[in-house]
Amino acid sequence: MRKFTLLLIALNFFFGCAGDQVSKQGSKGEYGYSLDSDVKVPMRDGINLATDIYFPTENNQRLSGKLPAILVRTPYNKQRGSVVSNAAIFFTSHGYVTVYQDTRGRYNSEGIWHMLDDDGRDGYDTGEWLINQSWSNGKYGMYGTSYVGGTQHAMALENAPGLTTIIPVDAMSNLGYYSMRYDGAFELRFWKWIHWAGQGGGRQNAKPEMKKMLGDFIDVENRRKYLNKLN
């Protein structure tokens, strides 16, 4: 909870325009929420990205007026249980519209996943869509760890419209240097991550045999057998 409190302090600082719709920092706020699931957000090439939008409510009615938003773009499933819902409900309770999106080719989103390659353009298009919604005050911030931090860097580099705050934690930065290799050495942990993360792609979910193959490589013995064949 302390981390959430510190994050809310930062968001309130950068979102000074939020007005009296946003409560003071602290524990859970005064508002309830309603959820629009799998909203299709169009990209410039016609691909639609699945997006969940949590709206603050009062007396079971959505708050009126223009509100700030928090955007999270993730390859790890926007509906990943309590980790997501608790954070979304927390921020929404303080008057923020909270937006979770599956990145391209992941889970319920269309397209093919290319690791962080499309996230700048897709993030820009998502931000442009967001600030043009009737409920938006034109400003939003982002937060998240690891790859979710990398999507923030990608959007910042694209100068995404309306983006006022990023809080990347332990985020990916230079994929050419800190990805498959570290100072020239192949990173086995990253290879394991690829097979684990690969199971969540839209194409993989549509092809059970592909999903099983990727899952089998998570087992250390299977990976060892494969690597031994490369010698």
What are these regions (language model features)?
Residues 5-14:
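Bacterial N-terminal signal peptides
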Residues 24-65:
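N-terminal cap/lid segment of alpha/beta-hydrolase-fold proteins
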Residues 93, 157-231:
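Accessory cap/linker subdomain of secreted extracellular hydrolases
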Residues 147-160:
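Short glycine-enriched nucleophile-adjacent loop
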